Each structure stands twice: as structure tokens, then as C-alpha cells.
Amino acid sequence: GTSNRYATAVRKSFLITGGAGCLGINLTRFLLAKGQSVTSLDISELDYADVRDQINAIRGDIRDTTTVDAVMREVQIVVHTAAALPLYEPHEIFSTDVDGARNLLKAAYSHGVERFIHISSSAVYGIPDHHPLLEDDQLYGVGPYGQAKVEAEGLCEEYRAQGMCVPILRPKSFLGPERLGIFAMLYEWAKDGKNFPVLGPGDQPYQFLDVEDLCEAIWLCATLSQSVTND
């Protein structure tokens, strides 16, 4: 079972950027169940009563260097999930997803953080012309979000070249508790026996990831040997 395979490890201090988001809250619960120490940094209020008193929740912007430097002081492992999503204005996407990542990497490096786990996106592959995609395939960022994600990975590689352990994960769209937006609506309609629209003939495959599986992948990046995870 999961509990045997991912046994509780040594207690570490984790910083989760975007801690109030879907991945952030699921990862927070996952890490707390592992006995880990969690600090959340998010521009939004963290409004989950089940974890609020068990973590250090800081409201702040990753684009603010003073905030980033302050929260990084006691941190051993960073999980960088914060991002401006594709619907945001291009300048917001680049300032958050590129400049924000640069601020975090710089502070993590200067404070000697053990690992910086960067949550990228399958958007770095653009519109693929073949399957399956491999981690060493060419990156083609389509649109501001895809371009920003490619640039942020480049920053990660720069700091990895300076000796930091910087695992990069490229998840597909993920689903799970707290996932808002259209998915929540579709599930509600299905649960209530209502009809909901199907695009096209209804047979086109789309790849989703369970957020719990993503949390386990992050945990492995945090706990396995650097020789395995630092790529």
C-alpha cells in the first residue's frame, strides 16, 4: 500500500508556493500526513480550516524579493507551484512565472536550500506532433504561458549547473479535491443526473493526472537520492 511504499521520512521544512491553490492544498495535506513542516506562500488567503493551524501560512507575492527572501530563511525544500495561468494577461504570466521563479531560485540558492522542486507543465511541449512525449523532446512553448514555462525551466537549469538540486516535473492537467472551475461543474451535473455537453464525437482522448499521484511524485523528488531526482 501507499503507506509502506512512501514511509514517513525525516521531518523537513517545506515551502509551498501557491499553497492556497489546488495542488498546494492537496500537497499540504499530503506532507502533514507524512509529519512534515509546511510553510505556504500565496498571494491569496489560505482558507482551509483543516490545515490552517498546522502550517505557517504567509500571504505574499513571489514577485516581491523582500517577502521571498524572508520566507526562504528556514526552508529545506521548496515546491514551486505558484503560477499565473493561461487566462491571465501576458505581462502577468511572465512577471509571475518567470520573474517570480527567478526570485525564488536566487533566494533558495543564497540560503542553501537542499532542493527546489519546480512544477512546470506539459505546456512546454506545445502542440505535439508525436506520442508518447519524452522528457528530452524539444520544447516549444505555445502562447505566453507555454513560453514562460519554458523560460522558467531554463532558469532552473542555470541554478542546477551551479550545484543546486532542482527536480522539474511537467504534469498534465490534474484532478482531485479542491479542483475548481469547469471540472467541478461537470462532476456536479453528473452527480445530479443532469445532462452536460460533450465536445465533438465524444471519443477524443484527453490525459488527466490524479493530484494524489502528483503529490507522490513530488514526495519522491524530495526524498530519493539527488542522483535520481536532479533532472
Q: Would you name each region that the model predicts?
A:
Residues R63, E92-N103, G143, Q147-A148, ...:
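Glycine-rich NAD(P)-binding loop of the Rossmann-fold in SDR/ketoreductase-type enzymes
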Residues E153-P177:
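Conserved beta-loop-beta element that borders a ligand/cofactor-binding pocket
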Residues Y187-F196, Y206-D231:
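Alpha-helical substrate-binding/gating segment
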Residues D99, N103-Y145, Y159, P167:
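Conserved Rossmann-fold NAD(P)-dependent oxidoreductase catalytic core, especially the SDR/UDP-sugar
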Residues F14-K34:
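N-terminal Rossmann NAD(P)H-binding glycine-rich loop of SDR-like oxidoreductase domains
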Residues D53-R63:
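Rossmann-fold cofactor-recognition segment
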Residues V142, K172-L180, G200-E212, Q226:
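Glycine-rich "substrate-gating" loop/helix at the edge of Rossmann-like oxidoreductase active sites
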Residues I62-T96, A107, V124-I127:
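NAD(P)H-binding glycine-rich loop region in Rossmannoid oxidoreductase-like domains
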